[in-house]
Regions:
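Residue-level signal for well-ordered, solvent-exposed loop/turn and beta-edge residues enriched
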Residues: 91-93, 160, 260
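Rossmann-like adenosine-cofactor binding region
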Residues: 172-257
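Short alpha-helix adjacent to the SAM-binding motif of class I
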Residues: 163-168
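Adenosine-phosphate binding glycine-rich loop
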Residues: 225-313
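Glycine-rich adenosine-cofactor-binding loop
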Residues: 112, 123-146, 152-161
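N-terminal ligand-binding/catalytic initiation module
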Residues: 1-105, 113, 120-123, 298-301, ...
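Generic secondary-structure signature for well-ordered alpha-helical cores
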Residues: 21-22, 30-38, 74, 117-121, ...
Length: 313
């Protein structure tokens, strides 16, 4: 026997973008991480032979539960595609279906900037974005919402795509330019944000300067890597979640295996930074800070609640 299911609203990519202005989204993530009310187990990550399948559930007390299904395939365009289902926890009934790809892009960028607001020098003026994929534009949008940037540099393996990304940023009023090498970007940047599917280091620790902040978004599988072991050895290291980092953060795990850093040297996670349990950078202007993220379903749920306009408990 079949039975008709009540229709639930679907929020497409455009609706998600409209509903998640970066200042509001960053604030929503801050509340979620500081509250301790949001919970997420380790995500299921499956290798599909050159591609990845991720299933990410989370819940907020007895109020909400959400699940995101993601595929990541470097051969696909866009490379990240997903759907998010937000449900009422008490009844189990779905409340909304949401474009998970846009939700992921925006909450990922917002989480990085939330961390940077505690770890980067407030006067940081130059952002260097490594990667020209779907995260490039949200990263630029998020950082410009929180820092008074005078220069945004973009690098990608494909120079034409880097120029296109910079041109798109300029069209939005941002002071962006493509550059030819990673080395040139590292030499100029106050903040470096890498969002790639790299399996070999792009960032060399030897090129880092005192006071920089490094934001590593890619390398969400153990075999992936955006920064070399020396990068971690020279930096004060922070993560989005300890469990996620130790399970999946490729470049961090490789640095630990190489003896460049001990797991115990990780200073804090995003919850500690948001709750005030850890002061973040503090007054240490000379420190190199590093935020390694692999993503957490807590971010998805907080963002989904913002999308449907229901952030109350």
């Amino acid at each position: 026997m079949t039975r008709a299911m009540a229709t639930i609203p679907y929020y497409d990519a455009e609706a998600v973008a409209r509903a998640t202005p970066m200042p509001a989204l960053i604030a929503a993530l801050l509340r979620a991480f500081a509250s301790g009310d949001y919970h997420a187990p380790s995500r299921l990550a499956a290798d599909m032979g050159g591609a990845s399948l991720l299933v990410m559930p989370a819940w907020k007390g007895h109020a909400r539960v959400g699940t995101k299904i993601v595929t990541v395939d470097p051969r696909a365009r866009p490379s990240i595609q997903s759907t998010y289902i937000l449900s009422d926890r008490a009844s189990g009934r779905p409340i909304a279906a949401i474009d998970g790809a846009m939700l992921t892009r925006r909450r990922t960028a917002a989480a990085s900037v939330l961390a940077a607001s505690r770890l980067a020098r407030p006067a940081s003026a130059t952002l260097f974005v490594i990667g020209t994929g779907a995260l490039n534009a949200p990263i630029v949008e998020a950082y410009t919402s929180a820092f008074e940037l005078k220069q945004i540099l973009v690098w990608g393996r494909d120079a034409d795509k880097a120029e296109a990304a910079a041109r798109a940023a300029r069209a939005q009023g941002y002071p962006a330019a493509a550059i030819a090498t990673v080395e040139a970007g590292l030499a100029a940047a106050d903040i470096v944000s890498a969002a790639t599917l790299a399996v070999a280091p792009l960032i060399a620790g030897s090129a880092l300067r005192p006071g920089m902040h490094i934001d590593l978004i890619g390398a969400f599988r153990p075999e992936m890597c955006e920064a070399d072991a020396e990068t971690f050895a020279r930096a004060r290291v922070f993560v989005d979640t300890h469990q996620g980092a130790m399970d999946e953060a490729g470049d961090l795990l490789q640095a630990i295996a190489a003896g460049a850093i001990a797991a115990a040297a990780i200073e804090a996670d995003l919850a500690a930074l948001c709750s005030g349990a850890h002061p973040g950078r503090g007054e240490d202007d000379a420190a190199i800070t590093l935020f390694k993220s692999v993503g957490t379903a807590i971010e998805d749920l907080a963002a989904a609640e913002l999308v449907v306009g229901n952030v109350a408990p």
